[in-house]
Amino acid sequence: MIERYTLPEMGKIWTDTYKLQTWLDVEIAVCEAQAELGYIPQAAVDEIKAKAKFDPQRVLEIEAEVRHDVIAFLTNVNEYVGDAGRYIHLGLTSSDVLDTALALQLVASLDLILEQLEKLIQAIRYQAQQHRYTVMVGRSHGIHAEPITFGFKLAGWLAEVLRNRDRLVRVAQSIAVGKISGAVGTYANIDPKVEAIACQKLGLEPDTASTQVISRDRHAEYVQQLALLAASLERFAVEIRNLQRTDVLEVEEYFSKGQKGSSAMPHKRNPIRSERLTGMARLVRGHAVAALENVALWHERDISHSSVERVAFPDCCILTHFMLKETTDLVKNLLVYPENMKRNMNVYGGVIFSQKVLLALVEKGMNREDAYRVVQGSAHQAWNTEGGNFEELVRADAQVTALLSAEEIDQCFDPQQHLTNLAEIYSRLDI
């Protein structure tokens, strides 16, 4: 991923140096396990741990000749270790190292993602608490529907990110597996106990039934969950973009001092953060498809997945982490305009209260079809008339006033009637 969208702590996990260090960590854990079981001398392990290191540039030089990254790495490590190096990689295949080390990278990445997700949860919950009863219009199909509150809208966001957190916690367990089982997974040249001990040292569980690789359904699930999270963040971003439209302007991204929105139009204050999040979600979703394609490897393994994963895993983890940070900052600094919300809600003189009028008439004994016709007629007249006022038309309709008193009509147009049960929802989310 390009540096522009890479936060340092996540970018570090996907550097060559970090990757090679995880390879070395796996090799040393295996050596320690073999020594504990009496397969190799403890003195050799001590020497390996004291001398083992690598030079990323030297590894690349060797790989240019041998055309195999793990062999290049082992060759470089042995240049430092000397004779004790013969015990490194004993009974292993390259994927024992690659897949186990990859699990360490994916777990470390998910730790950062979950940490940032917690910050987003706190930011959304705080804003929801501040706007529990900030009344605005709810929209369906992009059209005014009925009153809601901005806190209620944010409650939906909060519930969604909490579900994302639950899914990521589950996938963290699924991906935290290693394999030290040899060329086709049968432990033909290594004791399964070595795998168990080595994985324990690394904080992993042994894979249940690996081949030459860990089955890619685990990795596909991992990327799917990141894609789901990215899709949620995109949903929030798209909502902000729509609410920031000039003719809506109910919320707005924070516009910092000195910031400029257009090279041509000085007045512009564009929702660029939300737009950027929308684009990033497309990238993560694209990688989710590629991760699914990687599941169907040939027999006990082919290498078709490798080139995909060298791009997809770093990109997905780095982008998702960046998106979370951007969304958190966006929510924390979001500008909210309650007066504009109230203004928009009252367009056409209260057509959004049409259902309340309909139900009130039905409760008074009017046939539902007749009530619908009466209310729709006034609503559409208000809608189609410049400066139309639905409430005034309702109050002037003899069919309505024959059944509803002025006080009962007042109640129909009271926004608070729509908010009476919000406390139940808020209590579920600690808002």
Curated annotation (Swiss-Prot):
Give, as in the UniProt entry, the pathway in which the protein acts: Purine metabolism; AMP biosynthesis via de novo pathway; AMP from IMP: step 2/2; Purine metabolism; IMP biosynthesis via de novo pathway; 5-amino-1-(5-phospho-D-ribosyl)imidazole-4-carboxamide from 5-amino-1-(5-phospho-D-ribosyl)imidazole-4-carboxylate: step 2/2
Q: What class of enzyme is it?
A: lyase
> Which keywords are on file for this protein?
Lyase, Purine biosynthesis
Q: What Enzyme Commission number does this protein have?
A: 4.3.2.2
Q: Does the keyword RNA-binding apply?
A: no
Q: Which CDD domains match?
A: Adenylsuccinate_lyase_1 (cd01360)
Which reaction(s) are listed as its catalytic activity? Answer: N(6)-(1,2-dicarboxyethyl)-AMP = fumarate + AMP; (2S)-2-[5-amino-1-(5-phospho-beta-D-ribosyl)imidazole-4-carboxamido]succinate = 5-amino-1-(5-phospho-beta-D-ribosyl)imidazole-4-carboxamide + fumarate
- One MF annotation (Gene Ontology) recorded for this entry: N6-(1,2-dicarboxyethyl)AMP AMP-lyase (fumarate-forming) activity
The record's family statement is: Belongs to the lyase 1 family. Adenylosuccinate lyase subfamily.
Among NCBIfam families, the record links this protein to:
purB (TIGR00928)
- Record function comment: Catalyzes two reactions in de novo purine nucleotide biosynthesis. Catalyzes the breakdown of 5-aminoimidazole- (N-succinylocarboxamide) ribotide (SAICAR or 2-[5-amino-1-(5-phospho-beta-D-ribosyl)imidazole-4-carboxamido]succinate) to 5-aminoimidazole-4-carboxamide ribotide (AICAR or 5-amino-1-(5-phospho-beta-D-ribosyl)imidazole-4-carboxamide) and fumarate, and of adenylosuccinate (ADS or N(6)-(1,2-dicarboxyethyl)-AMP) to adenosine monophosphate (AMP) and fumarate.
Identify this protein by name. Adenylosuccinate lyase
Protein's organism: Synechocystis sp. (strain ATCC 27184 / PCC 6803 / Kazusa)
